[in-house]
Amino acid sequence: MGKVIIINGSPRAPRSNSKEYGEIFSSYYKGQADTFNITKKNHKEICSKIEDYTDILLVFPLYADGLPVTVLNFLKVLEENPPKNKPKVSVIINCGFIEPEQNNVCIDMVKLFCKQNTYEFNSVLSIGGGEAILGTPFKIFVKWKIKN
């Protein structure tokens, strides 16, 4: 089992659904997983820690059919401050739309970042109805998908 750095890119990080999705992942992951919330001032700090991990898990909501500005700004700093050993990148993205396909353009943006910066893109979990699903009986399906 590798070490995973979970990076919460939600603008509402401390009280976000993205935080809860990251916590669900951590509860099932058998290796070491550490979580960091992106803020306006900690981009370089997070970038300096990334080389200690085998995997990055970006967790964030869809914003206006794209990445939240918090994630965009972080990726710019990461591009300028790459780690020596580049971990694999995975994504958990959620949107308020029922259809998870609404996330596809955003996922392609992360894949493009990975391709341009020689990170291996590993896996993605695209969640529709992300704002509401955690408060419903359907939460079990999300937990099952994250676990597997």
Report the location of each language-model feature.
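Glycine-rich phosphate/pyrophosphate-binding loop and the adjoining helix
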Residues: M1, I127-N148
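N-terminal beta1-alpha1-beta2 submodule of the flavodoxin-like/Rossmannoid cofactor-binding fold
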Residues: M1-N85, K115-Q116
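Structural beta-sheet core signal
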Residues: I6, L58, V89-I93, S123
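Short, histidine-centered active-site or binding-site loop motifs used for metal coordination
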Residues: N8-S10, I93-G96, G128
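Generic structural signal for well-ordered, non-membrane alpha-helical segments
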Residues: P14, S18, G22, N103, ...
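Well-ordered, non-membrane alpha-helical segments in soluble/globular domains
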Residues: V71, N104-D108, K145-N148
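Ser/Thr/Gly-rich flexible loops in soluble cytosolic domains mediating phosphotransfer, phosphorylation
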Residues: K84-V105
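A hydrophobic alpha-helix/topogenic segment detector
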Residues: I98-P137
